[in-house]
């Protein structure tokens, strides 16, 4: 129980004024003081829900389904005091993502009746929970531009994308307000999980409200209006976008959506979310939005709106200043050489949805659907780095193995739990069997990296930034 939680009087007065009359303030405050239930989302790019359930049963993890996400679960573990959830082998291998249950709802809303996404934008994407959820929903097909304005958060976004085996993402690092002018009417699906005052995160962070003020709410609302206008300009006619926040006031939620109607009139339609999941109507507003107070579903506070663009809009004119794109599409000779060696050394192939691009000695696999956006803006990275060339061929990259390799690969080497711990600490390992050449390293039936046989040991190929210590699984 978070008895020392800080709830400003002005905040409570605001909630009292706007919360539906059938909800109780006493229950709201009591819910805010209860610790948040831990929740995860199974990464179906790496394993199915049924496969993960079997793993969980073997480890005596209790999984309770999240009603609005068929891959989401609240999790209870006996060993939670000794091994952190993020230090479990399953998490480190990308089999699941630690994600608050409410934050799974925006992507669920975006994917509903929207199975064939070709070009998507996640406008404010770090740390990557919704980006990886959307990529899994797209089955790594099409193209997903994941943008993050904060430079300090781009690194963790990149790390999570790689851990989860995402291959259809291009990362960008811009103020989201540029997209409407730079890429007008480009995306068929857009997620704007907007920066907000964070009123719904109290259960996770008891100090979340210490910097809150009515003035700060108004100030951040100005940014949100700019972002939602930019997103709407970037959306194709007929496309859908989801606007979401983890806050509770109307200024940052309903009012932002209504501002879009003020700006664009009949081009805007709000799509009702009352049938998104069982009992969704408990959080439904008159417009069809979901306004989730923490006591309704025993979760974080959240807001979700689904918006369809009915007709074209006139985007702002901008002048782009872009340097020369540093990559060149690989020619047929290069493609054959790379594909042949990849197959001969690791029995792997390039996904059909990706194509090879080369920059100096680097070989990258870009999503094919990104080709129309090459040269339209600058990218932090696109797709995944497959290899680096050297005098004896190609040096395959860890992130490529995490994206395309499976544990049943003929070249794989399965480690014991002791060896797997050594591996994650950056040390070479000595399995009982002996092989030769490069090998895909696995533990408990999941890919964890790439190594190379040197005598009777496997030389560790884990990137330095992924080396861990402490109490691992």
Swiss-Prot record:
The gene is rsmF. It is found in: Cytoplasm. It is an enzyme of class 2 (transferase). This is Ribosomal RNA small subunit methyltransferase F. NCBIfam families: nop2p (TIGR00446), PRK11933.1 (NF008898). S-adenosyl-L-methionine binds at residues 124-130, 148, 175, 193. Its main location: cytoplasm. Its EC number is 2.1.1.178.
């Amino acid at each position: 129980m978070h008895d020392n939680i800080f709830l400003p009087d002005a905040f409570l007065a605001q909630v009292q004024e706007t919360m539906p009359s059938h909800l109780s303030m006493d229950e709201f405050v009591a819910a805010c003081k209860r610790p948040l239930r831990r929740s995860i989302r199974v990464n179906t790019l790496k394993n199915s829900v049924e496969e993960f359930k079997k793993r969980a049963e073997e480890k005596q993890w209790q999984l309770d389904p999240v009603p609005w996400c068929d891959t989401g679960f609240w999790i209870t573990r006996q060993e939670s005091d000794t091994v952190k959830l993020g230090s479990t082998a399953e998490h480190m291998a990308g089999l699941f993502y630690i994600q608050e249950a409410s934050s799974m709802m925006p992507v669920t809303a975006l994917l509903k009746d929207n199975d064939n996404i070709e070009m998507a934008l996640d406008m404010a994407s770090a740390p990557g929970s919704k980006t990886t959820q959307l990529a899994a929903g797209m089955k790594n097909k099409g193209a997903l531009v994941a943008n993050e304005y904060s430079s300090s958060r781009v690194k963790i976004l990149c790390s999570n994308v790689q851990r989860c085996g995402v291959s259809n993402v291009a990362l960008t690092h811009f103020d989201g307000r540029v997209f409407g002018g730079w890429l007008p009417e480009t995306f068929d699906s857009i997620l704007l999980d907007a920066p907000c005052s964070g009123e719904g995160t109290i259960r996770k962070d008891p100090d979340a409200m210490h910097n809150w003020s009515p003035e700060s709410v108004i100030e951040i609302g100005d940014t949100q209006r700019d972002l939602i206008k930019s997103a709407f300009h970037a959306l194709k006619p007929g496309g859908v976008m989801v606007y979401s926040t983890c806050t509770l006031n109307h200024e940052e939620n309903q009012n932002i959506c209504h501002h879009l109607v003020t700006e664009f009139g009949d081009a805007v339609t709000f799509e009702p979310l009352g049938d998104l999941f069982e009992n969704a109507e408990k959080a439904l507003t008159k417009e069809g939005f979901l306004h989730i107070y923490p006591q309704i579903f025993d979760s974080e506070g959240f807001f979700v709106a689904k918006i369809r663009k009915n007709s074209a809009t006139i985007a702002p004119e901008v002048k782009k200043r872009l340097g020369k794109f540093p990559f060149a599409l690989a020619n047929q000779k290069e493609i054959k050489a790379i594909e042949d060696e990849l197959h001969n050394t690791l029995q792997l192939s390039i996904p059909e949805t990706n194509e090879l691009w080369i920059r100096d000695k680097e070989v990258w696999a870009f999503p094919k659907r990104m080709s129309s956006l090459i040269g339209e803006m600058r990218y932090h990275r696109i797709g995944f780095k497959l290899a680096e060339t050297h005098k004896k061929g190609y040096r395959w990259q860890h992130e490529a193995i995490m994206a395309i390799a499976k544990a049943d690969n003929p070249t794989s080497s399965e480690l014991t739990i002791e060896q797997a711990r050594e591996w994650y600490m950056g040390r070479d390992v000595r399995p009982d069997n002996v092989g030769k050449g490069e090998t895909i390293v696995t533990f408990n039936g999941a890919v964890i990296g790439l190594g190379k046989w040197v005598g009777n040991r496997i030389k560790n190929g884990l990137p330095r930034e992924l080396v861990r210590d402490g109490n691992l699984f």
